[in-house]
Amino acid sequence: LKLIPLLLAIAPVFAGSFAYREALPGYPYQFPRDHFEHQDFRTEWWYYTGNVSDAAGKRFGFELVFFRQGERHDSDNSSAWVAQDVYLAHAALTDASGKHFWYYERLNRAGPGVAGASFAKQRIWNGNWASQWSGDTQTLDAITDRFRFHLTLQPETPPIVQGENGVSQKAAGKGRASHYVSFPLLRVSGTIGSDAVTGRAWMDHEWFTEQLAPEQVGWDWFSVQLDDRTELMLFELRHKDGAVDPYSSGTLIDSGGKAHHLRRGEFVLQPLAKWHKYPVEWRIQVPGWGIDITSKAVLEDQELRDPANKTNYWEGAVDYSGNRRGVGYLEMTGYGQPVRFVK
């Protein structure tokens, strides 16, 4: 689950008559082809987050995300500039040691080479922000006014498919789901500015046409990379009345790399402390696996603010402590106003 306010805001303008596919059980995943664009689904994203440090112990969290929103029409116009897909990207950097958080966003239509996610090119890009693939190794580049990074991500485990029977179900009803693939542990090396850094990253890729139900107004999503080589993805969907949706779920990847689906009743997320309206400290329990940990933001203010659309959300680097230790990322949406995906 990821949120892009601007993408959601502009999508109704481009609504067309093209019949997009639904995310349905039994999807026949084919890698590496499925790591790239799926233009027969309406919405898609590639999401990178990581925690790294330099030789002196200076800590950073980084995020680079590419989004595609389909706006296809049944049209005979073959011009390369006809809007078929809109690509949005954002890059963010948390300087945990210096207590700074920066966020940048860019929007482009696909056009002739401006943005895309090409299997033929083995590349996902928006302008000069990019993820270049060589096998499963992914090299990230982003340049902004305040920071730049060049990072190579090497997976330590094969990609996993989240959910059950090929879909991550988000609500009751046919097609209210996504196809969801993760690289839960990537070893990182490279540079942030002039600092050489190493660490761990997580990569998500989702594609779908419709997900949320009307009563679902937001979510809390965790990636967890524990020092014992256990990884977790957990999300809770929230209703208007504050209730947790029964389609909330997760995945535990054991130290051998095997993925185990977690249903709503198999984990507990309990908010402990807030920064403004956002819970920035949580207790996380997975009783069946003996996990009882606390998530704490490395910097409280990691809110991504979008004044134009008034759809702010929080996403940033966290530490985990308790009976296990580790690092990860947390995303929280719908605390200011409900989140909506367009149909």
Predicted feature locations:
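Bacterial N-terminal signal peptides
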Residues: 2-13
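Structured soluble/peripheral alpha/beta segments that form catalytic or ligand/cofactor-binding pockets
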Residues: 16-343
